[in-house]
């Protein structure tokens, strides 16, 4: 059984390079809590001998169809409603969806993977302003809009209250703002050593495929 967790399990306050032995930390809201609870449940099942499990913690998965990192940002940028906290200097750890799926498949099949936790992310990181810059280029807009984390949190909190009153979902929640201001990245040496996995898709090629998908689905206007 493969449990799809997330790098958010490490919490948003940790800094530097984190491997799978780094303590988890519930400081990112309900999303983080659900990931930690599910990890606890499957590890308990493994310890009890009920089932063999593997936990994978994906990085910031992007590519065609990605709601949080392709679709939602494009929609917000088109409406001039997108801003980056930490002046765009937060760390983004992009992993293309095909590389992620390949890593999950290897984790499910490898005989030495049972009971293990694997980070499936890129090697290193990039600034959030560099990740989102192509989105602006695709739409023919200048940006990204870079603000302090404090200001971004204020705006996000207000937007969330308005969205709740109207029965809508605010995808740029305070938790998302905090996530985009983090200063951590993730070691993938364990996945390389045990699974023989590492990312193959270059960022430029991954974004080009994402752009084509976005254009084909009417997200880039006429």
What is each residue range found by the language model?
Residues 45-92, 97-98, 135:
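NAD(P)-dependent short-chain dehydrogenase/reductase
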Residues 106-172, 204, 208-211, 222:
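Mid/C-terminal beta-alpha module of Rossmann-like enzyme folds, strongest
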């Amino acid at each position: 059984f493969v449990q799809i967790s997330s790098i958010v399990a490490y919490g948003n306050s940790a800094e530097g390079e984190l491997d799978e032995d780094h303590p988890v930390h519930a400081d990112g809201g309900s999303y983080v809590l659900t990931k930690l609870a599910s990890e606890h449940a499957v590890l308990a099942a493994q310890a009890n001998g009920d089932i063999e499990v593997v936990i994978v913690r994906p990085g910031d998965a992007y590519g065609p169809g990605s709601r949080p990192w392709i679709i939602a940002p494009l929609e917000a940028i088109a409406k001039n409603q997108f801003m980056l906290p930490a002046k765009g200097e937060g760390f983004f750890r992009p992993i293309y969806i095909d590389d992620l799926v390949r890593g999950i498949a290897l984790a499910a099949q490898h005989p030495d993977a049972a009971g293990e936790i694997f980070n499936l992310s890129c090697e290193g990181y990039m600034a959030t302003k560099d990740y989102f810059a192509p989105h602006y280029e695709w739409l023919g807009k200048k940006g990204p809009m870079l603000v302090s984390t404090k200001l971004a949190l204020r705006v996000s909190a207000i937007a969330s209250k308005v969205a709740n009153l109207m029965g809508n979902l605010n995808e740029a929640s305070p938790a998302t703002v905090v996530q985009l201001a983090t200063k951590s990245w993730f070691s993938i040496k364990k996945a390389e050593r045990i699974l023989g996995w590492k990312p193959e898709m270059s960022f430029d090629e991954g974004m080009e495929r994402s752009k084509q998908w976005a254009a084909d689905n009417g997200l880039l206007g006429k």
